[in-house]
């Protein structure tokens, strides 16, 4: 359900604005999206895992808040990020 340290480092390297950037909204959203994707796959076989479902809902809400923040700060960064992650259809 959680992501490996190597995968997290790869996401940080891909979405970071500079070396060592782990706190930017882009990196946080990318890591949350990966965790959300993993949990979504987990629920396909564990439908009654309500404890983890609550964690999933918290992650989705956190990602939504970060996306709203990024949209307010810089519209171009927001657009490139959602295209890169494939969040909007």
From Swiss-Prot:
Q: Which InterPro entries match?
A: Ribosomal_uS15, Ribosomal_uS15_bac-type, uS15_NS1_RNA-bd_sf
Entry-linked SMART domains = Ribosomal_S15
- What are the record keywords, sorted? Ribonucleoprotein, Ribosomal protein, RNA-binding, rRNA-binding
In alphabetical order, the GO MF annotations are: rRNA binding; structural constituent of ribosome
**A Gene Ontology BP annotation from the UniProt entry:** translation
Q: Which CDD domains match?
A: Ribosomal_S15p_S13e (cd00353)
Entry-linked PANTHER family? RIBOSOMAL PROTEIN S15, BACTERIAL AND ORGANELLAR, SMALL RIBOSOMAL SUBUNIT PROTEIN US15M
HAMAP family the record matches: Ribosomal_uS15_B
- What does the function comment of this entry state? One of the primary rRNA binding proteins, it binds directly to 16S rRNA where it helps nucleate assembly of the platform of the 30S subunit by binding and bridging several RNA helices of the 16S rRNA. Forms an intersubunit bridge (bridge B4) with the 23S rRNA of the 50S subunit in the ribosome.
Q: Which family does it belong to?
A: Belongs to the universal ribosomal protein uS15 family.
Complexes and interactors: Part of the 30S ribosomal subunit. Forms a bridge to the 50S subunit in the 70S ribosome, contacting the 23S rRNA.
Say yes or no: keyword Chaperone present: no
Name the chain's protein.
Answer: Small ribosomal subunit protein uS15
Tell me a GO cellular component.
cytosolic small ribosomal subunit
Q: Which domain of life is it from?
A: Bacteria
